[in-house]
Amino acid sequence: MTLIKSISGIRGTIGGQPGDTLNPLDIVKFTTAYATYIRRNTTNGSNKIVVGRDARISGQMVCNIVCGTLMGMGYDVVNIGLATTPTTELAVNMSNADGGIIITASHNPRQWNALKLLNNKGEFLNKAAGNEVLAIADSEDFDYADVDHVGKYTEDNSFDQKHIDSVLALQLVDVEAIKNAHFKVAVDSINSVGGVILPKLLDKLGVEYTFLNGEANGNFAHNPEPLAKNLTGIMDLIAKGGYDMGIVVDPDVDRLAFICEDGKMFGEEYTLVSVADYVLSHTPGNTVSNLSSTRALRDVTEKHGGAYSAAAVGGGNVTTKIK
């Protein structure tokens, strides 16, 4: 049994004793601490927090507790349901919300879940903000809303389409070229939210597809980290022929891996470098990545006349470095 506290939120295994795992009492405690931090530091005025989750078995339970706690803190909750991490980040920004909570343990196994905390721009909290949330949780300096100020609850399932529309509107995305290529792909969405949004995106792009583990039921068919040792199913399928490529995502779709037409991994590091090369060739500029990324990112950035900077591991640290 494990509970890990960090600047980006808390994660742990479900069940067990308070203080040692991700259990209902600690979910309430850290959600309350986050809401307290937002109340003290955000001036959007919307009094609204977005909540999204991946398809983990524990997700509905955790979501119910998070939403109820936020309402108890006087916040109106917009529950966008099963949603990718990038979709939830986008929803915070599009809704002019005060913040957001993503309920996902990313590539960790099914017994794990987590609360990932966002600011009012849909960005992960930086180090200072994350430490303030942890300090508030430790002090338990909480003040819940009275009966006349309890928050409202709404559900909004429109953000998958809004996310897809925003991607297709990017100048760097040549929709017609993709349609004219008549691609056929295999997709492993590991029984989570990739199986909800990716068919909608691929349909818009005119891509023919076969899904493996496409049902978003949280019963992960294999270890959800998108590494070659976990992806023999889709790699073997593509190696038999008939597909242009394979697409693999993790449970909250913030990690992406490609499989080549011969069934071999293209690799996450190569994907990042290839995308950076394409983007910088059209829109030159500087780049930032975390210290665990490949050195090739520096090389491709400098090739296009830009400057590369490295940040500590963590989405909030990368965002801070960009700014």
Where are these regions (language model features)?
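An N-terminal, well-structured beta->alpha segment
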Residues: M1-G68, G72-M73, K152-V185
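Short, surface-exposed alpha-helical segments at coil->helix boundaries
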Residues: G59-N64, G130, G195-P199, R298
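Conserved PLP-anchoring active-site segment centered on the Schiff-base-forming lysine
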Residues: I49, V187, P284-V288
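Gly/Ser/Thr-enriched, mixed-charge loops and adjacent short helices
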Residues: T13, N113-A239
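Solvent-exposed alpha-helices and their adjacent loops that cap or buttress functional pockets
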Residues: L3, T42-N44, V92-S95, N108-R110, ...
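Proline/glycine-rich low-complexity loops and linkers
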Residues: L134-D165, C260-K323
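N-terminal small/polar loop signature for handling phosphorylated ligands or for N-terminal nucleophile
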Residues: T36, R40, K48-W112, K200-I259
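A structured phosphate/pyrophosphate-recognition subdomain
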Residues: L3-I4, G12, K179-D203, S292-K323
